[in-house]
Amino acid sequence: MGESAESGSRQLPAMSPPRRSVAYRRKIVDALWWAACVCCLAVVITPTLWMLIGVVSRAVPVFHWSVLVQDSQGNGGGLRNAIIGTAVLAIGVILVGGTVSVLTGIYLSEFATGKTRSILRGAYEVLSGIPSIVLGYVGYLALVVYFDWGFSLAAGVLVLSVMSIPYIAKATESALAQVPTSYREAAEALGLPAGWALRKIVLKTAMPGIVTGMLVALALAIGETAPLLYTAGWSNSPPTGQLTDSPVGYLTYPIWTFYNQPSKSAQDLSYDAALLLIVFLLLLIFIGRLINWLSRRRWDV
């Protein structure tokens, strides 16, 4: 019995796989996972780089500074009216959509409870899933036709603001949720008014995240074409300041319209507009990243 037990114990190590084979299989699995990750990353990055290279290589040779100082004239001219119109639309979205969205996010994070919070969250999640062209058509029927605003700055700003509400509200709610609970508890323990603590402590801490979400939502809104075709129309002149019955130019219109024209000057202007829009969107994203970096650096210090 002793010999059989001893021989069995000697055979046990032979039943376990060699360590080298286990390590080798792990390396193979890791390599396959890394290869899959690289392939997925390439699927996302390659079309983006291809688009950027195509636009830049086509726009830079034909770009001239007169595009920035001349208004559109038919299918030619410059893009000053579109640049100013895009900037005015962006400011309007920040003022209207940003205000409503931030207040919505604050209410959901700090005051709403139970069923009310669930209903509001469900509402803006549904809103985020509605195609932009549908929002544009609804805006056309409601604002342009029913309220008789005509193609105008106000109609375009309002539709883009509605589009941006889900993204900014979600970003605001997430930024407020990341504020440590100890900040609120300390303010309450010191007897500070709830409104004062919210403005001076909670919102101040969450502001970088709110601003970043607002800039990302603004970049998404400004890159839209269909909602503005239905609401803002198009104008060869810069905005006059009139809110209704005054069409507005914007950079996505020449990209969509001039590209299909047989004239080479119109196609060149389309690529110039695409280049300017890409620069504008990248600038917004860069500002958002810079705000995040400065915020983290401040808290690390």
UniProtKB/Swiss-Prot annotation:
GO biological process annotations for this chain's record?
phosphate ion transmembrane transport
Is Transmembrane helix one of the keywords?
Answer: yes
Pfam families, per this entry?
BPD_transp_1 (PF00528)
Gene Ontology cellular-component terms for this entry are: plasma membrane
Q: Where in the cell is it found?
A: Cell membrane
Q: Where is the ABC transmembrane type-1 domain?
A: 83-288
SUPFAM superfamilies from the xrefs? Answer: MetI-like (SSF161098)
Q: Does the keyword Ribosomal protein apply?
A: no
Specify the inducers: Transcription slightly induced by phosphate starvation, part of the pstB3-pstS2-pstC1-pstA2 operon.
Question: What residue ranges are annotated as transmembrane?
Answer: 36-56, 83-103, 127-147, 149-169, 209-229, 274-294
Similarity comment text for this entry: Belongs to the binding-protein-dependent transport system permease family. CysTW subfamily.
* Assembly behavior: The complex is composed of two ATP-binding proteins (PstB), two transmembrane proteins (PstC and PstA) and a solute-binding protein (PstS).
Q: Which NCBIfam families match?
A: 3a0107s02c
Q: What does this protein do?
A: Part of the binding-protein-dependent transport system for phosphate; probably responsible for the translocation of the substrate across the membrane.
Record protein name field: Phosphate transport system permease protein PstA 2
State the species of origin: Mycobacterium tuberculosis (strain ATCC 25618 / H37Rv)
